[in-house]
Amino acid sequence: MQIIFMNRLSRMAGREEEEFAQLWIGEEEGVWSLGWRDFSVNAVLESTDNLWYEGGSWNEMLCVYRHELAVKMGAGYRPLIDGGLHEEEVLPRRGREQLKLQYYSEHYSQESVYDELCAWRRGRASSERKAPYMLASNRLLRLLSTFLPKTTEELLQIPGIGEAKAAQYGADWLAVTSVAPRERDFPLSWVYEEIGDEEFSSWLYKQKELKYKRQLEQLRLNRTLLQGIDGGLGLEQLKNETGVSRRELLEALEELEKDGYSVEKLIELELESMAHEEQQAVWKAYEEFGDLFLKPVLYKVYGDTPPAAAGGLEIHYERLRLIRIRFRREQAGSLDSATSF
């Protein structure tokens, strides 16, 4: 095997003890290998090897590399030589400060206040018929339940809250946060001095670990989907194969189409039992209402009471999404043809 990349990393195991490790990538006859070698503190000649990846996909190997390296750096390891395949992101000052506020909120939020804000979000989302995350993310509610603003001026110092959002929901938030006791005041510059650089860096790598894990899972899911579609599998079989819900599978199929892959074989299979006239009615509804929202199309085609079907209402939405993939593909093709002149 030919070693094409190697780096050494270290971390402090105690006040005076330093641990070393080696990260390597090798290739032999088109097969990529990625590994980690721990060296004993007491005996340099003693080592423990861990094979992280072995296979033919360079892209998958890179995903594994980034994820596993982020895990190790989150545990305190740092490369002795920067660069290579390691991505070192330089954060602007404002971005770094906002991330420090997020870090602090994940460790010191008041759970009772957070729970009350979550209850508000559920009720308001239901009354507005919106997804809860559209009102406020978990991250934002953590920030609110940590720093406990008492005025609109303080509220606007929370990352993610602008004038419009403060005007829309600020009174509701302040009704919860302003009555909770707090120990520290605004402005929040004291947070930046209270957080140690090393603990913050480890937390940043934990965030990267989660990000790269999602990327790796998505890459492997896409590969399984494409292989399954090529093999003639339907949604239910792919669900059993991947352990992913049918809704998540449909979202992944939409993304694959955006990336230039064809999922038409699966669409044909899933729509075999749907009458051609019914499919045409859905298509015309997309032409009339656009393809952003499914509910207007559903009501246009089926009225207020869609016909009963095995799988309930969800099967109707699945078919709408599958036809929407075709519709968007044709619309994109028409746009490309128009702009080529």
Language-model features: where?
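Structure-specific DNA junction-binding interface
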Residues: M1-L135, T146-L148, E153-Q157, Q168, ...
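Linker/hinge segments immediately adjacent to helix-turn-helix/homeobox DNA-binding domains
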Residues: A119, P181-L210
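Short, Lys/Arg-enriched anionic-surface-contact patches
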Residues: S126-N138, S201-L221, V263-E278
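Residues in the helix-turn-helix
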Residues: K165, E248
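Accessory beta->alpha helical hairpin/"wing" motif in late/C-terminal subdomains of nucleic-acid enzymes
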Residues: A167-T177
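Short Lys/Arg-enriched helix C-cap and helix-to-coil transition segments
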Residues: T177-E193, G260-A275, R328-F341
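Positively charged, polyanion-binding regions of nucleic-acid-associated proteins
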Residues: L225, S273-D291
